[in-house]
């Protein structure tokens, strides 16, 4: 394992493509069918590794991590272990509660914050007494099973470090790029990275790409959010659910309060937060950010700001997450075009001034009346500077777009998350084994 990502086993052994990941999961399904046909396991059609299951497992992992006061880095490592393991093993042949406990146990060892095996097992039994055995040897056996399926490649690089490095670079080169992250933006980006572990991004893309995508959502789409909210101030006839994108407390990242649905589920333990952290992490996550984003706002964030003129386009069909598209290149070209227009207007004003003082005053007044005030907006200026940084960074913008799309789609699906359905399906499967 190398000290840098580019020579690491994470990149050389476990960085997959969309196709290879799909093939791996297809092989798991084929193996699952053979085991069912041979009578080795029973068939439970409701057990599906979809986003409902992923969010549920994410919440379980965070819940146990809180009980043990485990650092966020260790929890992130455990979640990647979980994702890797489930690319090779079917959910129907394992105890997912014991798997989560084992992932945390191994991750704490790797991240140098070890927890005693009896302590972890005891806390897990307090939370899930029906599913966690008393025998510590079961956890020890599962540990070897987990390590074997991951081919003993356990060390990981996370986007958190990349986020801090980017923030430090921007702060040190503020005179060059004129852009740096505020404490609030840094905290929001950190929280977005927390939630990104629900997706497959950490098996597909480098950590720095995910960090840039989190910054992109925090900084660039913040401008579109303000426009959407201004454009939708009069559209209060539809009751939309509330979504928390960033939070530094125990607030649920998605708080569903739909008055039109009588079967409202109480989602316990949903989080996008951290527990006990290092001194550097505490500086980022120490504040409680209660910024709320409306799900309708979130959907409109994925559109170009040019579409804000069309009221019918302000309401996307949230039932189709594939409509959630973010074109980074388009926004980049838009900001460059704004720069060119600004330069052209300033040049025109200067040339007019050379022809006479009266003409200069008249032209300046006319331009002031017709000038696009958005170019003077603080958020727009910050976006332009961020795009300038991306242009000089040589970061793969296609990968950034891919990461942003996956993260936005994840929040769309999270809004339809059904915890009780997943919990009940797992209960039926696991209790029938006893």
From Swiss-Prot:
Localization recorded for this chain is: Nucleus
The answer to whether UniProt assigns keyword Iron to this entry is no
Q: Does the keyword Repressor apply?
A: yes
Q: Which SMART domains match?
A: CYCLIN
Q: How does it assemble?
A: Component of the SRB8-11 complex, a regulatory module of the Mediator complex.
Q: What does this protein do?
A: Component of the SRB8-11 complex. The SRB8-11 complex is a regulatory module of the Mediator complex which is itself involved in regulation of basal and activated RNA polymerase II-dependent transcription. The SRB8-11 complex may be involved in the transcriptional repression of a subset of genes regulated by Mediator. It may inhibit the association of the Mediator complex with RNA polymerase II to form the holoenzyme complex. The SRB8-11 complex phosphorylates the C-terminal domain (CTD) of the largest subunit of RNA polymerase II.
The protein, known as:
RNA polymerase II holoenzyme cyclin-like subunit
């Amino acid at each position: 394992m190398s000290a840098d990502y580019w020579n690491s086993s994470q990149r050389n052994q476990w960085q997959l493509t969309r196709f290879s990941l799909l093939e791996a999961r297809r092989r798991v399904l084929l193996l699952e069918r053979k085991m069912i046909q041979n009578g080795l396991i029973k068939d439970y059609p409701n057990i599906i590794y979809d986003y409902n299951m992923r969010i549920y497992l994410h919440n379980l992992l965070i819940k146990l991590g809180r009980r043990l006061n485990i650092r966020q880095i260790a929890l992130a490592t455990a979640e990647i272990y979980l994702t890797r393991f489930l690319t090779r093993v079917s959910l129907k042949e394992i105890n997912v509660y014991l798997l989560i406990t084992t992932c945390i146990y191994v991750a704490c060892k790797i991240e140098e914050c070890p927890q005693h095996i009896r302590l972890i097992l005891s806390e897990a039994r307090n939370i899930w007494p029906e599913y966690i055995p008393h025998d510590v040897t079961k956890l020890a056996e599962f540990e070897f099973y987990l390590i074997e399926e991951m081919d003993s490649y356990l060390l990981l690089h996370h986007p958190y470090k990349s986020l801090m490095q980017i923030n430090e670079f921007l702060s040190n080169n503020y005179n060059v790029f004129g852009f740096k992250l505020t404490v609030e933006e840094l905290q929001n980006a950190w929280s977005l990275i927390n939630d990104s572990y629900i997706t497959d991004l950490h098996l597909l893309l480098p950590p720095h790409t995910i960090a840039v995508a989190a910054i992109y959502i925090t900084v660039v789409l913040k401008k579109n959010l303000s426009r959407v909210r201004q454009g939708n101030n009069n559209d209060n006839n539809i009751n939309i659910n509330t979504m928390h994108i960033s939070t530094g407390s125990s607030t649920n990242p998605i708080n569903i309060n739909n008055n039109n649905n009588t079967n409202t589920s109480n989602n316990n333990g949903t989080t996008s937060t951290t527990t006990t952290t290092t001194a550097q992490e505490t500086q980022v996550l120490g504040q409680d950010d209660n910024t709320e984003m409306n799900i309708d706002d979130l959907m409109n964030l994925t559109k170009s700001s040019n579409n804000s003129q069309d009221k019918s386009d302000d309401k996307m069909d949230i039932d189709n997450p594939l409509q959630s598209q973010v074109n980074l290149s388009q926004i980049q070209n838009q900001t460059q075009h704004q720069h060119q227009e600004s330069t052209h207007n300033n040049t025109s004003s200067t040339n007019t001034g050379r022809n006479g003082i009266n003409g200069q005053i008249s032209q300046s007044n006319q331009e002031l009346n017709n000038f696009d005030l958005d170019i003077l907006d603080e958020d727009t200026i910050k976006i332009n500077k961020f795009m300038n940084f991306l242009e000089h960074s040589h970061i793969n913008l296609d990968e950034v777009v891919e990461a942003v799309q996956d993260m936005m789609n994840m929040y769309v699906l999270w809004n339809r998350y059904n915890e009780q359905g997943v919990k009940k399906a797992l209960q039926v499967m696991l209790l029938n084994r006893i």
